[in-house]
Amino acid sequence: FKTVLSELQNKSEEIEIIDLYRCSFARPRDQLVESFKKLIIWSENIYIISPVWWFRLTPRTETFFDEVFTPGFAYKFINITKTYAYPKPFLKDKKVRTYITHGSPSLPVLTLYLNSVKLRLVMGVYTFVFGWRLSLFTKSRQCWSVPFVSEAKRKKYLESVKRDIKKDIIK
C-alpha cells in the first residue's frame, strides 16, 4: 500500500483511499456504500490491495464487492433466453490493478488449486463489473510467501509495483 501511495503522490495524482478496515461496517451502511460508489464513479484508476485468507480476499474486501459492485450500479444482466443471461458491465472505462499477497508459496496455489484465488476474482467479479479484457488478468499481481521472503525478494516485489504504477499513470 505504501509503495502504491508514494508512487501516485510522486506523480501528483489525485488520490482517494478507501481503507475497509477503518470503515464501520455496522448496519445500516447505505451511506457508506453510497460514498464508495461515488468514489468508484469518480476514479479513473482503481487499486485493490488485499491479502488472501482461506483462498479468497479478506471478508471486508469481499463485502465491498458484494455491496458496492451491485446489479444496476456496476452491471446488469442481459437476457439471451428465459433462463440464461450475461452481465453487461457499467464500469468498463475504469483501469483496475490488484495486488494480492499470499502467505503460501506459488507452487501449490498455481498447480493443486489451479490459481483459484485469481481466477475467481477476475472471472467471477471483475469481468461482470469491468468487462472482458486481458488486462484484468495481467494487472492482477500475486506476491507469494510474503511473510517468509527475503528482504531482497520483498524489494523485488515493491520494484515491480513501482514499475506498474509508472505504466498506469502515463497518459
Predicted regions and their residues:
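N-terminal beta1-alpha1-beta2 submodule of the flavodoxin-like/Rossmannoid cofactor-binding fold
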Residues: 1-77, 156-171
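Hydrophobic/aromatic beta-strand patches that form the interior of the parallel beta-sheet core
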Residues: 16-18, 47, 97-100, 137-141
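Short hydrophobic/aromatic-rich motifs at helix boundaries and adjacent loops
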Residues: 33-38, 93-98, 134
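Glycine-rich phosphate/pyrophosphate-binding loop and the adjoining helix
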Residues: 108-171
